[in-house]
């Protein structure tokens, strides 16, 4: 039985990465705030790229402060996708239901905006984490109902601290041996 505002988090550690998945974390204000802070802290010192699918531009300001937008890419004849380069990932996950899917990509400073737009990173983030090109990505899928974060194992301790914080808030955190992206 699921109680009001109860948050469940599953995570997996493998040889290349650490992953966590949660559903409806935005319904618990404290847990959502911790996730927002984790994503912002994780973005410091990294290049941040954002992809929104079926995200009306007028809703961008609900997800993050539009002052953090450094660049925007318009893809000709594609009204469904929006690509942004951000100065940081200070976001509000409570408004990710504005889009069918949203993803935040975290890179080191060697990757530039043009390289990001020209690669298949969007469709194969796990491959690029394994190759060391992508540090991490955060996905909001199913109109903000499910959240997925995967990063290089180099950042394992950051994720474990985040998970311990959620546990202290009363969230149910469980390590599992198998966890795959739910919408591949």
Regions found by a protein language model. Name each.
Residues 1-184:
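Structured alpha/beta or helical-core interaction and ligand-binding surfaces enriched in interleaved
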